[in-house]
Structure formats: structure tokens, C-alpha cells
A protein has these predicted regions:
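A structural signal for short, well-ordered beta-strand segments and their strand-loop junctions
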Residues: 71-74, 116-118, 151-155
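A cross-family acyltransferase "interaction/gating" segment
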Residues: 127-168
Length: 168
């Protein structure tokens, strides 16, 4: 099924690819409070991460009609998703980041783009019967202060299958 999708839509990039994913899976998104996101200029969107890759794809698809200058700070493994890699700044989560990566991160925080971050760093988990993020890392706050970027918190409502939470 994935191969069929990629054969049909593999030529799409960035938000167009995300729109196709949303259509394929028949997913609709409701945005509330979009007016709190500036229409231009630098802003950080700090989001919970309940759905893994799908929340990022859904958010790109929905937000792209409002702003086109979207970048995500992601696990560098996701740079292998060539249809989306132009939207990503990859971070090595399991080792040191090279000087070139630190430079890219600094450039992203210095730019005027919408910079999307999942501060927990991982998909939400089930704790004592409740689905929630791991503790948010504070690094993005330090960057936001130093670069004078506004931070807008974003709540994404959703959860994965019970099977996922039994695994983790």
C-alpha cells in the first residue's frame, strides 16, 4: 500500500506531499486559534506529539494555507524522507551534533520562518492510564529568548492505537 502511494505521489514535495497523504488517509484537520500565529515573521510553535509523523504531516498540510515558510526540528533519521526533507532541520538525538548541524539549527532559529518543535522529542506515551508527552526539553526556550522569537504553544488532540501504548 505504501509503495502504491509513493508510486502515485512520490513526485510531490513538502506541503503538496502532505496534502496527498491527508487525502489518501481521508484525514481532516480542524485548526482553532490560528489567528494567534503571526502571519509573518519569526515564531516558534511548540507542540505536543501524540501521533508521531502524522501530526507533523497534518500540521504542515493545515498550516501551509496560512504560512508557507514552515520548518521542523526533527530527528535526523527523518531527513531520509526526501519528499519532506526540505522542511526539516535534522538533529542527532543519540550522539553529538556536528558543527554544521549546530549551524543549521542556529540559522533556523535566526530566520523569519515558522519553526515547529516537538519539545518532548518523542511521541506521547501512556502514563498511569493517561496519554501525555514526556517532559519537554527546555532548549527551545533558551534559543527563543536569545533570538527574541515569540513562542506559541500548540495542542494536537489525538491518540494512537492501544497496541502502540502496549509496546511503549
Amino acid at each position: 500500500e505504501i509503495n502504491d502511494f509513493l508510486e502515485t505521489h512520490g513526485d510531490k514535495k513538502n506541503e503538496e506531499f502532505c496534502h496527498e497523504v491527508m487525502r489518501y488517509f481521508n484525514i481532516e484537520v480542524e485548526l482553532h486559534g490560528i489567528e494567534k500565529i503571526p502571519k509573518e515573521g519569526p515564531v516558534i510553535l511548540a507542540m505536543n506529539h501524540p501521533l508521531g509523523g502524522m501530526d507533523g504531516i497534518a500540521f504542515i498540510s493545515a498550516l501551509s494555507s496560512y504560512r508557507k515558510d514552515i520548518k521542523f526540528i526533527v530527528n535526523d533519521i527523518l531527513l531520509n524522507l526526501t519528499n519532506l526533507s526540505e522542511l526539516f532541520v535534522g538533529v542527532n538525538k543519540h550522539g553529538k551534533n556536528k558543527l554544521s548541524v549546530r549551524k543549521q539549527i542556529n540559522e533556523a532559529f535566526s530566520s523569519d520562518c515558522v519553526l515547529c518543535i516537538f519539545p518532548a522529542g518523542l511521541v506521547s506515551r501512556k502514563f498511569k492510564g493517561e496519554i501525555r508527552d514526556l517532559e519537554w526539553k527546555k532548549t527551545f526556550v533558551t534559543y527563543a529568548r536569545s533570538k527574541k522569537r515569540k513562542v506559541v504553544p500548540i495542542y494536537i488532540d489525538g491518540k494512537l492505537s492501544p497496541f502502540f501504548y502496549r509496546l511503549y
